[in-house]
C-alpha cells in the first residue's frame, strides 16, 4: 500500500513540475542575443490603440535602445504600419532619456501611435526600475 501511495505522489509531483515548466514566463525582462528585452504585454495591458492592446518588445544594449518591435495586436494593418514609424525614433537613444522623449503621433493612426509610445514609455520605466 505504501509503495502505491508513493508512486501516486511521485506521479503527481512530476505532473505539477511539467505543468509549471509549460507556463509562460511572466517576467517582462529577459535576455536575447546579448540584449536586455522588455516585453510590455503584461506591463501595459491597459494601454489601448484603436482596436486593443499594442504591446512591444524593447531591445536594450549597454543602456541604449537598439530596437523596438511591435508585437501581435488587433490594430488595422493599414494604419498600424504607419503608426510603427514612431518606434524608430527610440533607436540609438539612452534608455533613461528615451523614456522621457516627446514623440508625436502619426496623422491618420493617432490612437495606435500614441498607444505604442505609451507602451515604450512603460517598458523603459520598468527597465530603469528593475535592471
Language model segments and positions:
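Flexible, solvent-exposed loop/hinge segments and secondary-structure transition points
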Residues: 2-114, 118-131
